[in-house]
Amino acid sequence: MTNYFRSGDEIHYDCEIFEQTTSKGQGIRFYFDDITTLFPAEERVATIVYNVGLLINDAESIDDSEYLLNIDDPVIKTTGRAPMENAVKAIHMFKECVEALRHKYSNYKIAFACGWLDSRRHDAYRRVLSKMGFYETVVDDEPSLFRTYPAIDWIGYEQMKMAEMEEICDGE
C-alpha cells in the first residue's frame, strides 16, 4: 500500500493504492481516493469517504501518473486477458482492501463510493457490490454504488473472529 498526495488548485488528494499481479501478468490496482472534504461537515463527523478506482492492465504498463493526473475526469482504458480470473481476484482483493482500511482507521466510520465508466461495468459492479451491501446513489454529482461501514467495535470484532475460527475448526 502506498500513499500519494497531490495538491491541486483547491483540492488535496490522499490516495491509498493496493496492487497485485495475476498469473497472466495482468496488474490489478485499486485506488482509494479520500473525498471526505466533498461532503458537508455535519455529514462527515468521524467518517472517512473513499472514491474507489480500479485499473486492470498489463503489469508493466501501469502508470500511477495516468490515474492521478486524470483523477477528476478518469478515462482510463483497461484490458483483461483472463476476465474471470481478474474478476475473482479483484473481488477478493477489494474485500481485503476494505478490511485493511477499516483496521487502519478503526475509530472512524468508513464509506466507499464506486463509480463506473460504462453500462457494462455498472451492471457487473452492481451485481457484485450489491451482495456486499452497496446501494446506488449520487456522490459528487455522479451515480455511484455506496456503502458506509461502522467504526470497529474491537471487543465484538474479536468475538466474531473467534466464532469464525471455531466454525472452521469444527468443520474439519
Model-derived regions: residue spans:
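Non-catalytic substrate-recognition and accessory regions of acyl/acetyltransferase enzymes
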Residues: M1-E172
